[in-house]
C-alpha cells in the first residue's frame, strides 16, 4: 500500500471512530434524560402489555389521583407527602388498590388538592413504612375540570379530545370578524 492510501485510510478510520464515540455519548446522554410515564398500578404490577416495571433509582413520571386524607405537610418546612391511586372510574379508594407515596419538597401548585389528578416527575425509591415511593422534583396539577393530559386520559381509559369550537362560537366568530 502506498503512503497516500495509508494516510487516507487512517483519516477515514479516525473519522468513523470519532462518529461512533460521539453517537455513543449522545445516546448515553439521551437515556439519562428519559422520563417514562407510569400509573401507580403499573409501578407495583408492571405495564399490562409488556410487564415492564421501573427499577429503583429510575427517573419516571407518575400520574394518578391524590387519595383523600393522605396529604401530610411538615409544619417546619415545605416537605409534603401524599398517596396516588389509579384514575379508575368510578372514583372509589380502597386500601387494596395499588397506591404509591410521593414525597415532595417545594411549593405545590395552586390547583393541587385531594381527589385531584396530578403528574409528578421524580425518582423511584423505597421507603420502609410505605414501600415503593417517588422522590418528586416536580408536581403538576391539571388545569380545569375537563382538561386531562393525554397520558392520564389513556391510563383512565378515556379518549383525549382537543378543545373545539361549538357551532355558536364559530358563527359569532364569523359575524364579529373585521
Curated annotation (Swiss-Prot):
Binding positions for heme per the UniProt entry: 143, 147
InterPro entries from the UniProt entry: CcmE (IPR004329), CcmE-like_sf (IPR036127), NA-bd_OB-fold (IPR012340)
Transmembrane segments: 9-29
Record's bilayer topology term: Single-pass type II membrane protein
Start and end residues of each stretch annotated as Disordered: 154-178
Domain of life, source organism: Bacteria
Topology feature Cytoplasmic, residues: 1-8
A GO term, aspect molecular function: heme binding
One of the GO biological process terms: cytochrome complex assembly
Residue spans, topological domain Periplasmic: 30-178
Amino acid composition bias (Basic and acidic residues), ranges on this chain: 157-178
Gene Ontology CC annotations of this record: plasma membrane
Keyword Heme among record annotations: yes
Protein task: Heme chaperone required for the biogenesis of c-type cytochromes. Transiently binds heme delivered by CcmC and transfers the heme to apo-cytochromes in a process facilitated by CcmF and CcmH.
Family: Belongs to the CcmE/CycJ family.
Name this protein carries in UniProt: Cytochrome c-type biogenesis protein CcmE
Originating species: Colwellia psychrerythraea (strain 34H / ATCC BAA-681) (Vibrio psychroerythus)
